Every structure is written in C-alpha cells, then in structure tokens.
C-alpha cells in the first residue's frame, strides 16, 4: 500500500451503515434499533440475505453480515482504523490467520467511492474472535487497526420524536395541547441555548406508548403555534454519534500510526463535536 494514502485524513469517528455500528470507545460495537436502521430485509442464519448496496469494494458486499445485522452473532467483528488502501481481500487475508472468515465487508462512501475506514468480518467459529481480542495490537497496511466485537442492539419501542422548526416562543402548554391529541405524553424537553440562555427552535416529546408516534409520523410536517414543524423519530445519543463515523470526523489519536496530523482511522469511535444541547440525549435521523 502507498505511503501517500497514510497521510490523508480519514473519516472514522462514529458510523452506521446497513444496520451496523461502532460503539463509543470502551463499549462493544452495536447495531441500531429497527427505527434507526436503514430499510432492509433481515434474515436469520438459515434464511435469506439482504441486497448489498452500491459502492462496495472488490465486488459483492457481505450478504451474511448484512443478513444478521439485527441479530446476535458471536463470530462477527467490527474493524476500525483501516487504511484507505486496504481492500476486502487484504482484510480477509489478515484475519484468516485467526480462523476461517466466512464473510467480510469494507464500508464505502457512496459519494467519493473511497473506503470509510472501517468494515466487518464474520468468523465461522466464535473462538476466532477471542483469539483476535487476545492479541494486544493489530497492524494492517502499516496502520494500527482496532477490531471489536459486533453486537445487535435491542429493538426498543419508539416513543420519542423530534419536532424541528418550532417557534421558540411556543409555550409548553400549546405544544402539549397539539401533540396530546395523538396520545398521552410522558415528557416534553425544551432545549436551551447555553450561550444565549434562550429556548431553541426544537423540542423532544416522549409519549407513553408507541402508537402515538406512528400517528404523528403519518405527516412529515405539522403546524404548531403557527410554525410549520418537521417531525422525525428521535435517536438515542449513541446511535447519532456512531453516524458521525463517516460524516466528517477526522482522527484524533493515531495510537502509534504514522504522524500526528493525518488522523486516518481514529479510535475515538462514537465521539462527535457537540453542536447543540439536544445531542446530550437525542438527535433525529
């Protein structure tokens, strides 16, 4: 692999693709709930497979990995910190020394066609995962890479929504009056801009049941207190942060990688710059 590629910045600080995610540092990588995952058919180990998206490297992407995205699979691993030049074959060849690799994939940026610096592998035997984790350091194409266990996230019911484009002057009473017609409200969050000490133009509403959310989402826009508001499902902070893996995060800790400015393949999985107080809890997708 060329040395030049090693000096280029890489997008590897929080991600999700086809239902797979890298978790915050110190936690196991997870896969999102049904509400957060992109629409795709899923199947058990003995069922069918999902269709691989475009932009895959070295041919077809791992159907078996995609098919098990919402299921626990002890043989599946997330691999972060990959070089742009690392191919699917390179990834498979490296991990084959730990056991038989039945499937692997490298996630690609659909806009640039470049690797996003992370991928997934699926071992035939889960004992191979433990062998990988037992090794203190892994290097591939001149870079320190970071393999972790991949785990499925539980499908919790969706009860929380994001309401954007709301007039900051709209009272909680008016908000509750409008959305209360869809179902019983458990809580309303009114984020404050810490610099201006004023209400922000969005709120989060948690219903006691899941059905009201479905009713609200039948329309994308709602008029609340004279404002045309956009409604979306609110995502847990962990899911939002992982989506930043491929959306502009540039490495912070190279952990022994060449140079300190390139940042390709940062290991700060799940960490993103805060752009607003609402990221403390939820973010729409």
Curated annotation (Swiss-Prot):
GO terms for cellular component: cytoplasm; glutamatergic synapse; mRNA editing complex; nucleus; postsynapse; presynaptic cytosol; ribonucleoprotein complex; RNA polymerase II transcription regulator complex. It is found in: Nucleus; Cytoplasm. The gene is Hnrnpab. The modification Omega-N-methylarginine is found at residues 250, 255, 258, 275. Identified in a IGF2BP1-dependent mRNP granule complex containing untranslated mRNAs. Interacts with APOBEC1. Pfam families: CBFNT (PF08143), RRM_1 (PF00076). It comes from Mus musculus (Mouse). The modification Phosphoserine is found at residues 87, 247. This is Heterogeneous nuclear ribonucleoprotein A/B. SMART domains: RRM. The modification Asymmetric dimethylarginine is found at residue 275. GO terms for molecular function: DNA binding; RNA binding. Transcriptional repressor. Binds to CArG box motifs, single-stranded and double-stranded DNA, and RNA. It may be that repression by CBF-A is a result of competitive binding of CBF, a putative positive factor, and CBF-A to the same or overlapping motifs around the CArG boxes. Residues 25-43 have a biased composition (Low complexity).
């Amino acid at each position: 692999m060329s040395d030049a590629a090693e000096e280029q910045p890489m997008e590897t600080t929080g991600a999700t693709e086809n239902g797979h995610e890298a978790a915050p540092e110190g936690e196991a990588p997870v896969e999102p709930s049904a509400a957060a995952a992109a629409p795709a058919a899923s199947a058990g180990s003995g069922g069918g497979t999902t269709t691989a998206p475009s932009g895959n490297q070295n041919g077809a992407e791992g159907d078996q990995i995609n098919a098990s995205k919402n299921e626990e699979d002890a043989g599946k691993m997330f691999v972060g910190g990959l070089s742009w030049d690392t191919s699917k074959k390179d990834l498979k060849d490296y991990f084959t020394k730990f056991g038989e690799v039945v499937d692997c994939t490298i996630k690609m940026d659909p806009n640039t066609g470049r690797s996003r610096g992370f991928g997934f592998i699926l071992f035939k035997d889960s004992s191979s995962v433990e062998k990988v984790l037992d090794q203190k350091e892994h290097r591939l194409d001149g870079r320190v890479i970071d393999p972790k266990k991949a785990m499925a996230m539980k499908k919790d019911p969706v009860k929380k929504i994001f309401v954007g484009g709301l007039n900051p002057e709209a009272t909680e009473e008016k908000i509750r009056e409008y959305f209360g017609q869809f179902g019983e409200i458990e809580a309303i969050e009114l984020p404050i801009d810490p610099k201006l000490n004023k209400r922000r133009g969005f709120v989060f509403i948690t219903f006691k049941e899941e059905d009201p959310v479905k009713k609200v989402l039948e329309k994308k826009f709602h008029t609340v207190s004279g404002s045309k508001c956009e409604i979306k499902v609110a995502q847990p902070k962990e899911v939002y942060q992982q989506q930043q893996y491929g959306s502009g995060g540039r490495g912070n800790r190279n952990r022994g990688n060449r140079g300190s400015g390139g940042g390709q393949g940062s290991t700060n999985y799940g960490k993103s710059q805060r752009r607003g107080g609402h990221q403390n809890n939820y973010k729409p997708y």
